A protein has these predicted regions:
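Membrane-interface extramembranous regions
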Residues: 1-167
Length: 167
């Protein structure tokens, strides 16, 4: 159990760093992020978005990333305490929804490296390089789910559940 908690801590630190760093760049309306936004809307949806409008949206998204970072930090504190309400929150259904959102958002932003340009190759390597942006929260989602299964009624483990459903 402690080993999973340590892994959870490391993954939370990685996700916090990812979302905080990207959030700060977005709040600053980083030129690359604005170009990814306008390029994706043009190539995928056929909608031309002005640079000013894109910069406003990118900044708003940056603040949302910072909010996610704050929630992830609360989860980290709870996980480190290993007891109490914050600990329960770190593995709650709400936490799982946040991890699912973060994984989806991480994938979409990584994929924007491909969609903004419109060519799959060689831009696909930019997506591959950014796999941790979505895989860190996906791993957290898995561990939170595993934790909930392990602590459900009767102390069932994920292996027990899978074994029961396979027969």
């Amino acid at each position: 159990m402690r080993r999973n908690r340590n892994i959870y801590t490391l993954l939370l630190l990685g996700a916090i760093g990812t979302f905080f760093g990207h959030g700060m760049w977005a709040i600053d309306a980083k030129e690359t992020f604005v170009a990814l936004f306008t390029g994706t809307f043009d190539n995928v949806f056929g909608v031309v978005v002005s640079t000013d409008t894109a910069a406003d949206w990118v900044q708003a998204i940056g603040w949302f990333d910072i909010a996610i970072t704050a929630v992830l930090t609360v989860m980290l504190i709870g996980n480190l305490q290993a007891k109490g309400a914050l600990y329960e929150f770190a593995y709650s259904r709400v936490a799982m929804v946040i991890f699912a959102w973060a994984a989806l958002w991480g994938f979409l932003t990584a994929a924007s490296r491909v969609t903004a340009v419109g060519d799959f190759y060689p831009e696909v390597w930019d997506l591959v390089e950014r796999a941790p942006n979505f895989m860190l929260p996906a791993a957290l989602l898995y561990l939170a789910y595993q934790h909930r299964l392990d602590h459900s009624q009767g102390q069932l483990t994920a292996k027990d559940v899978l074994h029961k459903t396979s027969h």
